């Protein structure tokens, strides 16, 4: 309870109590003050939060302990002492700094004094007699912890010091004197014990059983054995409150003493109980109270009885928690009286026509809005006053007096000329329809709280306004839901906007003609948008021009600590600085805005500033919601924000506290609105932290910390990081001169303030970094490198908008030699006409001329300026790296990468990549190019990259007038720069630490500035030279690149050593900011000069393929298998096809045609991605409807996992150690073989999953029916021993990327997705008919929105569609070959899968023989035979497929052949596809074979077979051989391309002569085989894998086992190419049914024979030789897994059928 809410201490005891005390010679409870004295009362529970303690004391001691309590020795305590004869209170909460109160009233005068102590959360008040003070502690906790009893007069000696929070209290002197009437709240506490006390302590006369006071009177102990009763508030009197009091006659609520027509009151103020005071009502007197909640008021109509008075009196009582509000008003224009509460003080304004008289009454401590009753009295009386001036005569003036609670009085005088108060308007109580418009009103909002007994009286009549309102007088009008009783009106809780993104949306403000807004705010931050609302743009119809559209708007914003008002009613805006000083000082600031038509005022802390809007319009038409604290994120783009509101464009939301918001006089519950809207970052309180937020150094990575409002703000500019604490690495984009990023904004933006920052790194002296461009004007803000300096250009197109033309584009330069290949930070700050350009914290300032300050733009471009319609000189394209582009608070690069925005297009590469732009190869020393003359007269900046193994060669030469020339050459592995400006030739030699002809790329910079300082920089090492004399280089003739004609070398100057041309590669050639296309721009091209750079290396090395690509050795070079890397390109260094999935989700769906749905036993999936999401679905593959098989790659809790089901339970595998939700690029590789799976994230170790075997009772029952009785037991034992696992992913129907259909959409970028030979993203980019896209999707690398010149042509992303094979193999399979056919284009796509495919058109399901098929007759168990389709090139074939080596063999030699006994039949091979050894085995032209060892199951292969990228290809033959024949290298396979393009190298492994196939059930006789393993496998069932962190060294030996990631697939095709699918041993669901009947009969019979033979072989073999393809599920026996050779007999070759009898393969499984 607040101070004064229950008991107000009068200056002295009430007369009755005082007389009783004097008569009895008051002693009370007597404390002798001796050692060991103490009194112990029950715990004061009210001290915890709200409560009161009161007592009377009489003493002459100057220092003593009165009261003490604490929390038992921890933090909280409360101590009341006598110090120097005055009361001193100390207390604290939550270990905060203790608060101290020292009163001035002396109490050591041996008289009685009344003491009241009030607790209210953090605040505690102390009052003695008429003096009251309060203090507050700044603690985290509001409640005081009370654990001890209440000690009075001393501390018991048995209380240990450790149990006292304030240990010094035990040494304070005990109290000496009398203490009476101790109460906690309304009741006395229980005395638990005492020592050294005399008097009534042992005889509690006021105990409930002995209390003599009746009717609720309060019992008071006056002296030992004597009590008194306090009868106030009871309506009774007498000694024991037993006598009923009678009500007074007349106006009972006023007791006034009048004298000669004047209203008098006591000199010291009419306190309670004093003469002329307003008495508290008794029980017999009726109170007239009303509750006002901000929208209620009542008014008395004075039009029939106007007021004309010279003497007035107004009395009322109020109770409120609100700081501001109108209590009473009457009058208009010149005559009025206004009584209001403003900032917790009572404010009186009286105007009698001669100017306003104002009086302010404030309490000494606290405020009047303490929810306690306060009495107000206002009088106006005629008094004689001595005038001051030349007349020096006495004059009559009116004395105006206002008193609050009788003790606070303010007086003043009005002028005599105007003595009458006239009013014929209304008497408003508690508010008005428009408080802001009332004359003289200091507030704009209505009252919230209780008003009681409002009475107006003059010399003619008296108006009891509260009574009239309650009784419903006809002249009294009531507004709102008035309640005629006092109810608690909750205070308008303040709210805190904790971040710039926080805001609260208020209902639309209808203030067309008039309006008012008032609020309080408190902050320490300099900038922020407080209020904003706007209307519909005028002229926004069809055909209207964006720049001419205007919208009404209203805004208040903080800029640099000053408060600004912005207003536009459609005919011109005003921007008014409303505060004369900065208001971000952390203190509450009151703002009051009032408008009437074009006129109005804004008041800041009672300092009013008038304004007059421009134009003729008087109507403010606002359509949007009224936003408080900021703007919604989506609205920032969709709303056409007025450029005059700078904080809106800069996205600088307000951070701080707001309270007491009133709109048109009506309150707004901000806390309730924030909670209802779920406003993020809006807290329902306001407190200011005293601790420095930056003290803990929260900013990481070099970020600069600055203090905000209860927060720290990290400036991450220049760190390369983003985020709240600079914790997230900023996205880096790499540009090669043909790359760009373009942000295409949804609407035209108009701004007058911009904040731009970015980091860059480049070796070129020229290049565009960032530019805003417009489709309709020449407006631009452009940053570019110009001669190694940073150049800022700001152009505002004045001619277009009809403003006064300026002198042209403003230009600022900063920095120098910024092309040093180091990171630099640039920042641009524009505020209207003011410009700032900072480079690496060095700032240059400038001012723009002219009045036009509005910048229009539609795009933000980097790297290349594509919008060129309004520019005469196009800036040079950028080569280098950009990072951390933030434009007006938006990190566009990171948003584009993460998919947060959908309006960006780019082909620049993410990541810090080595940049080699437009390389060309000079294949011989006699090759060269001739370009136009080099322009290098006054200065020069040249840059290029080169790579060579030649030690010497001429790189660049240009002759000139006289002896002028320039030469750059390579001499003995070092760069020489030779020049002559007319003073004779000079030579500068590069100081590289070693020769640069090391076949690595090197960077060369040659420059000459206007000061004639020459610079030669090789990589990071620089040489400079200053030359005197001539300063100009006057060149003419052609510029030769790479060499000269032979006859010109002899004429070169003597310092030039070259006598031959350059052989190697050149790239990124920059000639004074121009990027020539060396091939297209050449005037002459002599010799072999070709695009690209083919290095001299032709053998696989560890560095041959990047990003874990697998190097495949060819006869005349090598290729890289990039399928499981997510990258593409010749060496797996180009990004794969990349899509950005935006907010709201997107989906890419690849659907197999119903006739071509594959079923696989093995799957391979690889994908790259980056995201900040912790939960999303990346890829999902579903089977046909009703089957239920699926495979899903997802992110859960920031980690990657895969779940799949191929007919059994869900099987999961995940990588819990790799967090992928960090926004960085990650690559996931997944393989499945049956129920076994592997998962690898980036370079983390491979995770493996081997589920336990299971069997299906139904399936077993079906199979068991076909088995003879005598074999049943054997089969049962075998099944139980081995366990069966469902392994086939049946009838795959669709691949879905993005997770939108699963309710967990992915947001970010996905790149290079590969699944079983399909590159779905590449197909989507090619608009494949089987691919459907939906949602917010963006292809990275789409062409720019305008055609670019040859200099800016974007490179085409590679669409690597690997040619693969689909095999059909299982442990025991019946396979027949089918007639080969030439695939169509659809086949080349739909058959592009590399896994085991099993299906049967005759059986509805191929799921492990779940469905029964009729058996057929005949057939024997044979091994699977893989055939090759006809090699006739399809109509759109692009290159002949080649067969990579199996992982067991590919590092060995360049050519591997198969033995004669293991070759497939020749029927499926075309003679033209063979090499020179397609003849008999004993052909003398063929090289002798070389023997090499195999691995594991020893599968063999045939190089003439179609290509594959699945390890399954190498494990499909269940043969166990002990030797493989390797052939020496041979010529490549002939090119089968029909389009004339260069084909891939020929077949890597040459086939030997045709031979019959091996017969089923028989094995070749071989000698024992010793494997060439450098390291044995890891153990049973654990195959070896690549080293997890980096690619393995390619050396002879076994580096990988089948079935693991990073295995070779097929040769990637070139851009946009796809090879034919090769042999497709796939059984589709709905192929031709020819021969179905025959097949069913034959297949059924064959099933029985298979089982019989299997059982027989099982009963007659050892464990190490059974022909189960254990590599399928990674469950192998020890002999197979440790490298030992399995001994078997070789089967004989069966006859190869000359003609396929069926056009469809079929398989059946048991």
Curated annotation (Swiss-Prot):
Where, by residue number, does Ca(2+) 2 bind?
779, 796, 854
Where does it mainly reside?
membrane
Can you give the residue ranges of the Laminin G-like domain? 29-206, 289-486, 493-686, 732-904, 918-1093, 1137-1345
Entry-linked SUPFAM superfamilies: Concanavalin A-like lectins/glucanases (SSF49899)
The record's keywords, sorted A to Z, are: Calcium, Cell adhesion, Cell membrane, Cell projection, Disulfide bond, EGF-like domain, Glycoprotein, Heparan sulfate, Membrane, Metal-binding, Proteoglycan, Repeat, Signal, Synapse, Transmembrane, Transmembrane helix
Q: Which GO CC terms are listed, alphabetically?
A: cell projection; glutamatergic synapse; presynaptic membrane; protein-containing complex
Q: List the disulfide bonds.
A: 206-219, 213-229, 231-241, 450-486, 657-686, 694-705, 699-714, 716-726, 1065-1093, 1100-1111, 1105-1120, 1122-1132
Q: Which CDD domains match?
A: EGF_CA, LamG
Topological domain, Cytoplasmic: which ranges?
1656-1710
Signal sequence span is 1-28
**GO terms of molecular function:** calcium channel regulator activity; cell adhesion molecule binding; metal ion binding; neuroligin family protein binding; transmembrane signaling receptor activity
Listed binding positions for Ca(2+) 3 are: 1189, 1206, 1288, 1290
Membrane-spanning ranges: 1635-1655
Q: Name one Pfam family in it.
A: Laminin_G_2
Function field: Neuronal cell surface protein that may be involved in cell recognition and cell adhesion. May mediate intracellular signaling.
Q: What is this protein called?
A: Neurexin-2
Specify the species.
Answer: Mus musculus
> Where is the organism placed in the taxonomic lineage, from the top?
Eukaryota, Metazoa, Chordata, Craniata, Vertebrata
């Amino acid at each position: 309870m607040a101070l004064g809410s229950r008991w107000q201490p009068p200056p002295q005891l009430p007369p009755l109590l005082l007389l009783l005390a004097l008569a009895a010679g008051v002693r009370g409870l007597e404390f002798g003050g001796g050692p060991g004295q103490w009194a112990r009362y029950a715990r004061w529970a009210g001290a915890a939060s709200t409560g009161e303690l009161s007592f009377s004391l009489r003493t002459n001691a100057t220092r003593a302990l009165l009261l003490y309590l604490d929390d038992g020795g921890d933090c909280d305590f409360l101590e009341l002492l006598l110090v120097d004869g005055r009361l001193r209170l100390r207390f604290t909460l939550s270990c905060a700094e203790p608060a101290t109160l020292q009163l001035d009233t002396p109490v050591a005068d041996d008289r009685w004094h009344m003491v009241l102590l009030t607790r209210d959360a953090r605040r505690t008040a102390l009052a003695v007699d008429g003096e009251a003070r309060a203090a507050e502690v700044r603690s985290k906790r509001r409640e005081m912890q009370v654990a001890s009893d209440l000690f009075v007069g001393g501390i018991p000696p048995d209380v240990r010091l450790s149990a006292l929070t304030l240990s010094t209290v035990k040494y304070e002197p005990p109290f000496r004197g009398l203490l009476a009437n101790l109460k906690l709240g309304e009741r006395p506490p229980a005395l638990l014990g005492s020592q050294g006390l005399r008097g009534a302590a042992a005889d509690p006369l006021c105990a409930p059983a002995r209390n003599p006071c009746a009717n609720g009177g309060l019992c008071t102990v006056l002296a030992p054995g004597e009590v008194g009763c306090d009868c106030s508030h009871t309506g009774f009197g007498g000694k024991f409150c037993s006598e009923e009091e009678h009500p007074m006659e007349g106006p009972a609520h006023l007791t006034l003493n009048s004298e000669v027509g004047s209203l008098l009151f006591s000199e010291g103020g009419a306190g309670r109980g004093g003469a002329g005071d307003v008495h508290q009502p008794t029980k017999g007197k009726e109170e007239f109270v009303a509750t006002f909640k901000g929208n209620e008021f009542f008014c008395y109509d004075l039009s029939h009885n106007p007021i004309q008075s010279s003497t007035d009196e107004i009395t009322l009582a109020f109770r409120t928690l609100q700081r501001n509000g109108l209590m009473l008003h009457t009058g208009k224009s010149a005559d009025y009286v206004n009584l209001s509460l403003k900032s917790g003080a009572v404010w009186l304004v009286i105007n009698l026509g001669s100017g306003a008289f104002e009086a302010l009454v404030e309490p000494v401590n606290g405020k009047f809005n303490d929810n306690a009753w306060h009495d107000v009295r206002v009088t106006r009386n005629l008094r004689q006053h001595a005038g001051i001036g030349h007349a020096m005569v006495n004059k009559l003036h009116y004395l105006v007096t206002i008193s609050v609670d009788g003790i606070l009085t303010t007086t003043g005088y009005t002028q005599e000329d105007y003595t009458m108060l006239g009013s014929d308007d209304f008497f408003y109580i508690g508010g008005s329809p428009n408080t802001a418009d009332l004359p003289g009103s200091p507030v704009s909002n209505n009252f919230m709280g209780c008003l009681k007994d409002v009475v107006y009286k003059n010399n003619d009549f008296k108006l009891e306004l509260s009574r009239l309102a309650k009784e419903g007088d006809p002249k009294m009008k009531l507004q709102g839901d008035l309640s005629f009783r006092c109810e608690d009106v909750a205070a308008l809780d303040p709210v805190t906007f904790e971040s710039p993104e926080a805001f609260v949306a208020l209902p639309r403000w209808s203030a067309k003609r008039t309006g008012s807004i008032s609020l309080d705010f408190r902050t320490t931050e300099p900038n922020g948008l407080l209020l904003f609302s706007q209307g519909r743009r005028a002229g926004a119809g069809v055909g209207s021009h964006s720049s001419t559209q205007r919208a009404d708007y209203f805004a208040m914003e903080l800029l640099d600590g000053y408060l600004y008002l912005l207003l536009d009613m459609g005919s011109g805006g005003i921007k008014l600085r409303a505060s004369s000083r900065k208001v971000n000082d952390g203190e509450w600031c009151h703002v009051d805005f009032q408008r009437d038509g074009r006129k109005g005022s804004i008041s800041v802390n009672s300092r009013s500033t008038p304004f007059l809007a421009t134009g003729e319009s008087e109507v403010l038409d606002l359509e949007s919601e009224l936003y408080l604290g900021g703007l919604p994120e989506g609205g920032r783009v969709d709303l056409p924000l007025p450029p005059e509101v700078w904080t809106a464009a800069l996205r600088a939301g307000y951070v701080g506290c707001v309270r007491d918001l009133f709109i048109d006089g009506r309150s707004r519950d901000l806390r309730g609105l924030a909670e209802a809207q779920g406003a993020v970052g809006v807290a329902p309180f306001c407190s200011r932290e005293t601790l420095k937020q930056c003290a803990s150094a929260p900013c990481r990575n070099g970020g600069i910390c600055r203090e905000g409002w209860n927060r720290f703000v990290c400036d991450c500019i220049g760190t390369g990081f983003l985020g709240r604490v600079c914790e997230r690495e900023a996205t880096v984009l790499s540009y090669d001169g043909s790359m760009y990023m373009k942000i295409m904004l949804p609407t035209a933006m108009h701004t007058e303030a911009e904040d731009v920052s970015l980091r860059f790194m480049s070796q070129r002296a020229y290049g565009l970094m960032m530019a805003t461009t417009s489709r309709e004007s020449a407006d631009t803000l452009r940053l570019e490198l110009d001669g190694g300096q940073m150049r800022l250009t700001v152009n505002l197109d004045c001619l277009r908008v009809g403003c006064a033309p300026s002198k042209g584009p403003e230009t600022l330069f900063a920095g120098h030699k910024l092309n040093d290949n180091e990171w630099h930070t640039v920042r641009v700050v524009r505020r209207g006409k003011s410009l700032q350009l900072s480079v690496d914290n060095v700032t240059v300032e400038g001012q723009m001329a002219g009045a036009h300050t509005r910048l229009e733009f539609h795009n933000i471009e980097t790297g290349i300026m594509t919008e060129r319609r309004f520019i005469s000189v196009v800036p040079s394209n950028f080569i280098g790296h950009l990072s951390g582009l933030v434009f007006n608070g938006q990190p566009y690069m990171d948003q584009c990468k993460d998919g947060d925005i959908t309006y960006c297009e780019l082909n620049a590469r993410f990541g810090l990549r080595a940049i080699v732009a437009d390389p060309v190869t000079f294949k011989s020393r006699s090759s060269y190019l001739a370009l136009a003359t080099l322009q290098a007269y006054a200065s020069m900046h040249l840059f290029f990259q080169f790579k060579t193994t030649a030690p010497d060669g001429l790189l660049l030469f240009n002759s000139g007038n006289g002896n002028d020339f320039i030469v750059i050459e390579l001499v003995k592995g070092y760069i020489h720069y030779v020049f002559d400006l007319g003073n004779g030739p000079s030579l500068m030699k590069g100081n590289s630490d070693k020769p640069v002809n090391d076949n690595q790329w090197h960077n060369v910079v040659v420059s000459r500035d206007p000061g004639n300082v020459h610079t030669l920089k090789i990589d990071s090492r620089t040489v400079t030279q200053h030359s005197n004399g001539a300063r100009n280089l006057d060149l003419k003739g052609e510029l030769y690149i790479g060499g000269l004609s032979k006859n010109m070398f002899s004429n070169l100057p003597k310092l030039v050593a070259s006598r031959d041309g350059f052989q190697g590669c050149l790239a990124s050639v920059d000639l004074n900011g121009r990027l020539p296309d060396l091939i297209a721009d050449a005037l002459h091209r002599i010799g072999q000069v070709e695009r690209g750079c083919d290095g001299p290396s032709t053998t696989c090395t560890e560095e041959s393929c990047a990003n874990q690509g697998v190097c495949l050795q060819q006869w005349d070079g090598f290729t890289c298998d990039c399928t499981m890397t997510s990258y593409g390109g010749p060496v797996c260094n180009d990004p794969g096809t990349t899509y950005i999935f935006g907010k709201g989700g997107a989906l890419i769906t690849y659907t197999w045609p119903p006739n071509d749905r594959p079923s696989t036993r093995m799957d391979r999936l690889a994908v790259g991605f980056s995201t900040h999401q912790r939960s999303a679905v990346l890829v999902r593959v579903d089977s046909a409807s009703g089957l239920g098989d699926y495979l899903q790659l997802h992110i859960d809790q920031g980690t990657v996992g895969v779940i799949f089901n191929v007919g059994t339970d869900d099987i999961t595998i995940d990588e819990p150690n790799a967090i992928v939700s960090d926004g960085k690029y990650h690559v996931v590789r997944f393989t499945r073989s049956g129920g076994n799976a592997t998962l690898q994230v980036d370079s983390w170790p491979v995770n493996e999953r081997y589920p336990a075997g299971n069997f299906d009772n139904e399936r077993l029952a079906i199979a068991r029916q076909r088995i003879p009785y005598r074999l049943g037991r054997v089969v049962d034992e075998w099944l139980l021993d081995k366990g069966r696992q469902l392994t086939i992913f049946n009838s795959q129907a669709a691949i879905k990327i993005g997770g939108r259909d699963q309710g967990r959409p992915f947001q970010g970028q996905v790149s290079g997705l590969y699944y079983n030979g399909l590159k779905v993203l590449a197909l989507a980019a090619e608009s494949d008919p089987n691919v459907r896209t939906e949602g917010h999707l963006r292809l990275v690398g789409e062409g720019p929105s305008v055609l670019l010149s040859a200099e800016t042509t974007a490179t085409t992303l590679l669409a690597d569609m690997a040619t693969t094979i689909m095999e059909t193999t299982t442990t025991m399979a019946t396979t027949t070959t089918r007639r080969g056919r030439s695939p169509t284009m659809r086949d080349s796509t739909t058959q592009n899968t590399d896994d085991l495919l099993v299906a049967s058109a005759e059986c509805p399901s191929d799921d492990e023989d779940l469905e029964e098929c009729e058996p057929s007759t005949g057939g024997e168990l044979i091994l699977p035979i893989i055939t090759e389709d006809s090699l006739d090139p399809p109509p759109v074939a692009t290159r002949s497929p080649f067969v990579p080596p199996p992982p067991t063999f590919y590092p060995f030699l360049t050519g591997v052949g198969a033995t004669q006994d293991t070759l497939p039949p020749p029927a499926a091979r075309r003679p033209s596809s063979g090499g020179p050894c397609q003849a008999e085995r004993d052909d003398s032209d063929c090289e002798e074979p070389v023997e090499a060892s195999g691995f594991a199951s020893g599968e063999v292969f045939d190089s003439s077979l179609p290509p594959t990228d699945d390890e399954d290809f190498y494990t499909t033959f269940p043969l166990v051989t002990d030797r493989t024949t390797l052939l020496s290298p041979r010529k490549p396979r002939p090119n089968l391309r029909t389009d004339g393009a260069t084909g891939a190298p020929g077949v890597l492994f040459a086939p030997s002569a045709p031979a019959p196939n091996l017969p089923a059930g028989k094995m070749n006789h071989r000698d024992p085989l010793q494997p060439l393993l450098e390291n044995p496998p890891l153990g049973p069932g654990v195959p070896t894998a690549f080293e997890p962190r980096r690619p393995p060294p390619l050396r002879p030996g076994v580096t990988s086992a089948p079935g693991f990631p990073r295995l070779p697939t097929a040769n990637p095709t070139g851009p946009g190419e796809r090879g034919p699918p090769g042999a497709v041993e796939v059984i589709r669901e709905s192929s031709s049914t020819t021969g179905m009947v025959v097949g069913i009969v034959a297949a059924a019979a064959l099933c029985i024979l298979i089982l019989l033979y299997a059982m027989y072989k099982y009963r007659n073999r050892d464990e190490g030789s059974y022909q189960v393809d254990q590599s399928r599920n990674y469950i192998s026996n020890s002999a197979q897994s440790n490298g030992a050779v399995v001994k078997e007999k070789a089967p004989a070759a069966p006859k190869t059928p000359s003609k396929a009898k069926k056009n469809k393969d079929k398989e059946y499984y048991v």
